[in-house]
Amino acid sequence: MNSSDLKNDSYLSIEGVSKKFEQFQAVRYTNLKIRKGEIFCLLGPSGCGKTTLLRMLAGFEQPSEGRIFLDGSELTGIPPFRRPVNMMFQSYAIFPHMTVEQNVAFGLKQDQVAKDKIREKVQEALELVEMPKLAKRKPHQLSGGQRQRVALARILVKQPKLLLLDEPMAALDKKLREQMQLEVVDILEKVEATCVMVTHDQSEAMTMASRIAIMNEGEILQVGTPSEIYELPNCRYTAEFIGTVNLFDGTVIQDEVDHVIIQSPVLKHPIFVDHGITGTEGMSVTVALRPEKISMASKPPKKPHNCATGIVQDIAYFGSHSIYHVELETEKLVYVHLPNPERGASHATWQDKVFLEWNPHSCVVLTH
C-alpha cells in the first residue's frame, strides 16, 4: 500500500473515542478509519450510540475519551461552527419563511461570502440537485423529496470536508425513500463527498453505503461492505440484525483445515461446512444460513449432511418471491426464500411435506 492509500484510509480517523453521560455509557472505546470520498454508514437500533457518535463528529458533543482527526487535523475540542463539517438533520431544518435559494445561501451569508460568489455557488448547488427552476419557491410548496434536496444543497454549497446525514430518509414514505436513496448517492458521488450517515434502516444502509459499521450498546461489532456484512457476519447479533437468517446452535464434531462438521440438536443430519474454523471438537458454535441459500424439493436428497425434512406451515407472498415457513421434525422453524414460478407452474403449498438442502459454502460458522 502506498502513502496515498494510507492517507485515503484515514481521512477521518476516530481513535479510542468514548462518551459517557453520568452513569450511562453511550459510546464505548471506538476506533474507525473512514476513507476520503466514501459513504460510510453507522447502522444499529435506537439507543445504540450511533447518533451520539455522529454528534461528536459534528462537535455538538465532546468525547469523554479519545480523539478525532479529519484530513490530518484534530477536531477534538473544536466548536461546531469552526469545523469543516456540515450536518443534515432528520427534520431537514429548512427555514419555512425563506425561499429555496435563500435557504441554500444561508450558510454562505453567515460566513460573509461575497454576494456574487454566493449567487454562483447557490446556482451550482441547485443544478447539482436538479432544482434551479424551483429557486423562488417556499418549503411548503415543495414535495418531501424536493425538501430533502434543498437540505442536501444547503450542506453541499459550503463544500465541507465531511458531510453528516442523520436518518436522511426517515421523513419520506417507502416508495419515495427508495427513489431518493439512489438519487442522494448519485449526488454525493458526483462531488466526491466524504459522508457519514446514521440510520436504523437496514435496506437504506445496504443501498447507500460503501461500508457499514454495525453498532449495538455503544460498541461497533463489525465493519464491512454491504455484501461482507450480509454474507459473512462475524457474530450472532449481526447475522440476525441484517436481513432474515436461520440459526442452528450446535457442537463441532470434526474440524479440519478444509472443513468442519457440526451436529445440531434441531437437525437429524450434521452440517458440513467447506472450511475449517480452527476450533476444537466439542466446541459450541452457531451456524448461520440465509433463507435464499436453501433449496426445497418434494423428494429427499441423496446426501448424508446439509439437509432436513419438514412441513410447510406458512407462505408469505411478495410478488417476485415467496418466503416459506417450514417446521422441521424437531419443531424448529426454518425460513426458505424462493423465486415465484411462472404463471401456471407451482411450488409447494400449505401442509406439504418438503425436503430442504443447502451447499457446504452457504453456511457461516459463528463462534460468538
Task: Tell me the role of every PLM-derived stretch.
Residues 39, 80-86, 90-240:
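ABC ATPase nucleotide-binding domains
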Residues 43-45:
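The feature captures the beta-strand-to-loop junction immediately N-terminal to the Walker
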Residues 58:
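Helix-to-loop junction immediately C-terminal to a conserved catalytic motif
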Residues 64-67, 117, 217, 249:
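Conserved coupling/switch loops of ABC nucleotide-binding domains, chiefly the family-specific signature
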Residues 66-74:
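Conserved ABC transporter NBD signature motif
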Residues 245, 255-368:
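Non-catalytic connector elements of ABC transporters
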